[in-house]
Amino acid sequence: MNKKDTCEIFCYDEEKVNRIQGDLKTIDIVSVAQMLKAIADENRAKITYALCQDEELCVCDIANIIGITVANASHHLRTLHKQGIVRYRKEGKLAFYSLDDEHIRQIMMIVLEHKKEVNVNV
């Protein structure tokens, strides 16, 4: 077992632990985790990236861009919508999707930039 990345003795900073535990009780970390989990799916990450590149895309465009069926794209878009990542508007029989706000674009761009800086293999 590689012990280079772990403490060799058990001790902790009680003040830091108590402060951060208190902070965690005041935020909705479960919702944050659910939002990040939604984007963590490969197809949903591709959809999010596509919507970073163009302000608004219809479901058919998205399906073609990432190479899945319209039904599958709709399923992924519903998941993203439920998590507040995308919004949509109807125009006749077409549904157009966009990112919910600039924060989502920033998150995606920051993660992409970070990926360039670190050597992480999946």
From Swiss-Prot:
One of its GO terms (molecular function) is metal ion binding. Cd(2+) binds at C7, C11, C58, C60. Residues 24-119 form the HTH arsR-type domain. Keywords: Cadmium, Cadmium resistance, DNA-binding, Metal-binding, Plasmid, Transcription, Transcription regulation. Residues 59-78 bind DNA. It comes from the Bacteria. CDD domains: HTH_ARSR (cd00090). GO terms for biological process: response to cadmium ion. SUPFAM superfamilies: Winged helix' DNA-binding domain. Homodimer. Metal-binding repressor for the cad operon. Involved in resistance to heavy metals, such as cadmium, bismuth, zinc or lead. Metal binding causes the repressor to dissociate from the DNA. This is Cadmium resistance transcriptional regulatory protein CadC. It comes from Alkalihalophilus pseudofirmus (strain ATCC BAA-2126 / JCM 17055 / OF4) (Bacillus pseudofirmus). The gene is cadC.
